[in-house]
């Protein structure tokens, strides 16, 4: 019998989120990694990596870090301060039912929400098919030829529609007409977009105030924000006669019952797909849509999924016409948008797949019937209801009773819309119940039930839809939930996301999106709040926004933040507008020159162009640093008109430049402001603050540094932080402070995903965030050290260090073996990895960012794969392997390759199970290498006909 030993207390913390859950390497592994790099301590590595001049003086501190349970309790306490009423406010945001099969298997599934933008098509086939379904759905419902894979929100899409109209219009006019019945936030964003570009905006009644000769385009709301349903066919014909372009902002659910914009002759249709199963979420995120006529498709902004073939001739999907995008076209791009809303577009497309055309039409009919019943009840009470015909929205003039009725409705648990000083509006939706109608009638003084009225239709007969939609078999095959679940699973199995392996994309920060951070976004206290509810119903949101703002200010050294921008690119746009407005307020509106280094993100020059700035390009030295002499020369040359500079720190080359403070001082000396792109903030948190370095404004990518998942290409969040002197010029919003300058449809952007970043901050604490930054730098330097000798690291600091990412040079392989960077990327798929960022910021290179969340084992697996690829290239160099028919040129290999006839001069095992690949759980690419040229030359952007599915199966 053993003698009991004395009980020993331990300091082990099983629920230490920062060190045990978020940060990948253990302390012992960090010690081993540091030895490989040549350091005895993590702090020693950090001291050698960051210039002392940019280090922050005080540590990042804010309370003790919380455990997951403590953080969730805090989130629950905060969420309970929001009041969840039934909101009939409408105005572009409507109650909807998210089918549980979609919520559980897509919204809450890391296979969908942790994926990256599908720039590597072979490992994105599932997402690309879902997005092709989305584009098909939009084309069918709008009656137009080509749709993109989503935009940020409806108001942004409308502003993009205006910009596109100006590009393709034959008119020389510099004015754009806006239907006064557009949603107020849409009008606000159009004004914001137009003003810096010198376009005037005319708001009025299109049937009385529009002269097509005076404008390059016009936008009409269909149905209108107050419910009117008009046929714009005649107006559109008149616009075309004058060489102008027509844009129709259409309710996607109404289009199941109403004549499509395409049938009216519209050139462009925009709108939101939110009411296809995506919660309102206090403003977002939601997927906006844009569809256009075929003749103008190459001028359309955003991503476009198309059909191509792979190396075997099998059908494959890819992003088409990428040369339009900002990362290639820079200031000549159609837009600065590089973020779509993929996760939300996928949800909306699956809503259509789940319900099919009959189901969606039935939902629309039921919504309309509810609106008719509501109108009948109000008319019985003696109120005049407008308009006479409508889809889901009505307006009632109640005179001096407005305030009393609005308060009475709130007491009944219902929010109605305040319209002017005497009217009340209401929009019925999928979630409206009979009890809600009866509650509204009581607020108006009635006391009857829904059984007192007969349902009927009040849609204008001349506008009833007669054309089919959603005819493709995909919208008819998944009625049973068993089939729907399997379809979603089949698609997700075709993709490679963070739930399978690390995604080492440079400048993308694909870190852990912890489950505890994700849980609150589906709580109704966050997801079911309309963005325009009275302030006292969103006190929980207010508390969270204030605390997150305070934390972000502490991280950055800024004094104020705007949470409005829905993406990093939109943050750039908002930040540059803030700078522009600051100069105008100081009587220096002539300052319009923006200095941008050649190494900058492509969004930087595209954003500068959007706010009317002139881009002056600054050279970069051979070592990757900004050429200080060239910068000084150009700053002095343009001193009288210098507005700002845009720099990224650490640089896009993955190095902390030592001259950054001097650059900031030069800009300030000549009257400009400094915009520091926050894309690489994951290398700075807790160690260095942009506001201390000399920057005036930055955006933060919350979908990078602060754990919001990339969602396969969106959602994102790009809030901007500013120093105090710029704070008065931050974006306003018509529904909050009434100030101009709105950049998003909702005042706080995609507010419902902010709990992710907030809970990350709560669980990490200041010390944990700082440690995460240090480990991100450690992991990048470890990879650089492991790959040394096989690949050159292109840029290092004077001390031989990289920041949180490194660029390896694969260009020598082209001359020695014929192996391209594309070959390396596709071979990594065979190893089970998403490729690092390809050919940016330097063509023919790979930029690797491992983040702090990856374990040493995963880093080693990646390094083994990269080293094995180098050995395969060496075999080609030595003549041991054919220069054309080899594993690199034929990658990725599929199951079809494995089981088919094999006539290649290397083995099946070498092809399919290279070092780094799992044998039991191997990821198999569903297609061989995709033919990009074929896809652009034979552009198909909707679901292929059913015959092609049969052909593909043969």
From Swiss-Prot:
<comment type="subunit">
    <text>The glycine cleavage system is composed of four proteins: P, T, L and H.</text>
</comment>
<dbReference type="InterPro" id="IPR003437">
    <property type="entry name" value="GcvP"/>
</dbReference>
<dbReference type="Pfam" id="PF21478">
    <property type="entry name" value="GcvP2_C"/>
</dbReference>
<dbReference type="GO" id="GO:0005960">
    <property type="term" value="C:glycine cleavage complex"/>
</dbReference>
<keyword id="KW-0560">Oxidoreductase</keyword>
<comment type="function">
    <text>The glycine cleavage system catalyzes the degradation of glycine. The P protein binds the alpha-amino group of glycine through its pyridoxal phosphate cofactor; CO(2) is released and the remaining methylamine moiety is then transferred to the lipoamide cofactor of the H protein.</text>
</comment>
<dbReference type="GO" id="GO:0005829">
    <property type="term" value="C:cytosol"/>
</dbReference>
<dbReference type="GO" id="GO:0004375">
    <property type="term" value="F:glycine dehydrogenase (decarboxylating) activity"/>
</dbReference>
<comment type="similarity">
    <text>Belongs to the GcvP family.</text>
</comment>
<protein>
    <recommendedName>
        <fullName>Glycine dehydrogenase (decarboxylating)</fullName>
        <ecNumber>1.4.4.2</ecNumber>
    </recommendedName>
</protein>
<dbReference type="GO" id="GO:0016594">
    <property type="term" value="F:glycine binding"/>
</dbReference>
<dbReference type="InterPro" id="IPR049316">
    <property type="entry name" value="GDC-P_C"/>
</dbReference>
<dbReference type="InterPro" id="IPR049315">
    <property type="entry name" value="GDC-P_N"/>
</dbReference>
<dbReference type="InterPro" id="IPR015422">
    <property type="entry name" value="PyrdxlP-dep_Trfase_small"/>
</dbReference>
<dbReference type="InterPro" id="IPR015424">
    <property type="entry name" value="PyrdxlP-dep_Trfase"/>
</dbReference>
<feature type="modified residue" description="N6-(pyridoxal phosphate)lysine">
    <location>
        <position position="704"/>
    </location>
</feature>
<dbReference type="GO" id="GO:0019464">
    <property type="term" value="P:glycine decarboxylation via glycine cleavage system"/>
</dbReference>
<dbReference type="Pfam" id="PF02347">
    <property type="entry name" value="GDC-P"/>
</dbReference>
<keyword id="KW-0663">Pyridoxal phosphate</keyword>
<dbReference type="InterPro" id="IPR020581">
    <property type="entry name" value="GDC_P"/>
</dbReference>
<dbReference type="GO" id="GO:0030170">
    <property type="term" value="F:pyridoxal phosphate binding"/>
</dbReference>
<dbReference type="InterPro" id="IPR015421">
    <property type="entry name" value="PyrdxlP-dep_Trfase_major"/>
</dbReference>
């Amino acid at each position: 019998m053993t003698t009991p030993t004395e009980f020993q207390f331990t300091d082990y913390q099983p629920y230490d989120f920062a060190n045990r859950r978020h940060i990948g390497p253990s302390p012992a592994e960090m010690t081993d990694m540091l030895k490989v790099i040549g350091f005895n301590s993590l702090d020693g590595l950090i001291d050698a990596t960051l210039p002392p001049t940019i280090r922050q003086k005080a540590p990042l501190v804010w309370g003790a870090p919380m455990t997951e349970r403590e953080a969730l309790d805090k989130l629950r306490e905060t969420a309970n301060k929001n009041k969840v009423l039934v909101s009939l406010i409408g105005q572009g945001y409507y109650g909807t039912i998210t089918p549980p099969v979609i919520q559980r298997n897509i919204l809450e599934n890391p296979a969908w929400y942790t994926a990256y933008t599908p720039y590597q098509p072979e490992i994105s086939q599932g997402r690309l098919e879902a997005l092709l379904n989305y584009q098909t759905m939009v084309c069918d419902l709008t009656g137009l030829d080509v749709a993109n894979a989503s935009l940020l929100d409806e108001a942004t899409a409308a502003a993009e529609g205006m910009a596109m109209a100006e590009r393709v219009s034959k008119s020389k006019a510099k004015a754009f007409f806006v239907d006064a019945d557009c949603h107020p936030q849409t009008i606000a964003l159009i004004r914001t977009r137009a003003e810096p570009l010198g376009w005037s905006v005319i708001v009025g009644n299109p049937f009385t105030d529009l002269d097509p000769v005076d404008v390059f385009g016009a936008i009409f709301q269909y149905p209108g924000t107050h419910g009117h349903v008009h046929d714009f066919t005649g107006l559109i014909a008149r616009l075309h006669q004058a060489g102008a372009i027509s844009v129709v902002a259409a309710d996607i659910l109404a289009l199941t019952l109403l004549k499509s914009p395409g049938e009216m002759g519209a050139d462009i249709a925009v709108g939101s797909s939110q009411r296809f199963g995506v919660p309102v979420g206090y403003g977002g995120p939601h997927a906006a849509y844009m569809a256009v006529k075929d003749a103008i498709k190459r001028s359309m902004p955003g991503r476009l999924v198309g059909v191509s073939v792979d190396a075997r001739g099998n059908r494959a999907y890819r992003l088409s016409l990428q040369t339009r995008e900002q990362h290639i076209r820079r200031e000549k791009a159609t837009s600065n948008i590089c973020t779509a809303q993929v996760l939300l577009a996928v949800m909306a497309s699956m809503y259509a797949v789940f319900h099919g055309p009959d189901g969606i039409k039935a939902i629309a009919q039921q919504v309309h019937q509810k609106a008719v019943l509501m109108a009948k009840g109000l008319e019985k009470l003696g109120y005049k209801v407008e308009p006479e015909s409508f889809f889901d929205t009505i307006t009632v003039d109640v005179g001096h009773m407005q305030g009393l009725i609005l308060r009475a409705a709130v007491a009944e648990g219902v929010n109605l819309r305040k319209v002017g000083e005497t009217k009340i509006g209401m929009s019925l939706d999928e979630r409206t119940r009979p009890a809600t109608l009866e509650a509204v009638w009581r607020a108006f003084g009635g006391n009857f039930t829904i059984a007192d009225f007969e349902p009927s239709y009040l849609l204008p007969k001349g506008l009833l839809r007669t054309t089919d939609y959603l005819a493709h078999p995909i919208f008819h095959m998944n009625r049973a939930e068993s089939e729907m679940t399997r379809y979603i699973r089949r698609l997700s199995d075709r993709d490679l996301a963070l739930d399978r392996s690390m995604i080492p994309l440079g400048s993308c920060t694909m870190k852990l999106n912890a489950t505890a951070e994700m849980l609150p976004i589906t709580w109704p206290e966050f997801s079911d709040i309309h963005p325009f509810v009275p302030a006292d119903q969103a006190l929980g949101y207010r508390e969270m926004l204030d605390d997150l703002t305070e934390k972000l200010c502490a991280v950055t050294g800024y004094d104020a933040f705007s949470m409005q921008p829905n993406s990093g690119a939109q943050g750039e746009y908002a930040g540059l507008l803030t700078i522009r407005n600051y100069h105008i307020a100081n009587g220096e509106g002539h300052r319009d020159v923006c200095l941008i280094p050649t190494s900058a993100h492509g969004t930087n020059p595209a954003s500068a162009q959007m706010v009317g700035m002139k881009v002056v390009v600054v050279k970069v030295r051979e070592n990757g640093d900004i050429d200080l002499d060239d910068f000084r020369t150009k700053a002095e040359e343009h001193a009288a008109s210098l507005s700002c500079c845009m720099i990224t720190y650490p640089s896009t080359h993955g190095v902390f430049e030592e001259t950054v403070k001097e650059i900031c001082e030069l800009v300030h000396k000549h009257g400009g402001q400094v915009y520091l792109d926050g894309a690489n903030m994951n290398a700075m948190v807790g160690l260095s603050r942009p506001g201390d370095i000399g920057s005036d404004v930055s955006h933060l990518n919350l979908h990078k540094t602060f754990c919001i998942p990339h969602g396969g290409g969106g959602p994102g969040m790009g809030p901007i932080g500013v120093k105090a002197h710029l704070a008065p010029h931050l974006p306003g919003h018509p529904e909050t402070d009434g100030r101009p300058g709105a950049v998003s449809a909702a005042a706080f952007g995609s507010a419902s995903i902010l709990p992710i970043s907030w809970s990350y901050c709560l669980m990490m604490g200041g010390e944990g965030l700082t440690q995460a930054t240090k480990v991100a730098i450690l992991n990048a330097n470890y990879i650089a050290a492991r790959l040394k000798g096989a690949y050159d690291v292109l840029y290092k600091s004077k001390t031989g260090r990289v920041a949180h990412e490194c660029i390896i040079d694969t260009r020598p392989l082209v001359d020695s073996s014929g192996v391209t960077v594309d070959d390396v990327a596709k071979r990594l798929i065979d190893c089970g990895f998403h490729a690092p960022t390809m050919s940016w910021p330097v063509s023919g290179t790979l930029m690797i960012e491992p983040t702090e969340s990856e374990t040493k084992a995963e880093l080693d697996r990646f390094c083994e794969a990269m080293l094995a690829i180098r050995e395969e290239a060496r075999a080609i160099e030595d003549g041991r392997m054919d220069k054309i028919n080899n594993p690199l040129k034929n990658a990725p290999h599929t199951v079809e390759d494995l089981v088919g006839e094999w006539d290649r001069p290397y083995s099946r095992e070498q092809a399919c199970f290279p070092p780094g690949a799992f044998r039991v759980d191997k990821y198999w690419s569903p297609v061989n290498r995709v033919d990009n040229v074929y896809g652009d030359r034979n552009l198909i952007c909707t679901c292929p006909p059913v015959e092609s599915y049969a052909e593909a199966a043969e």
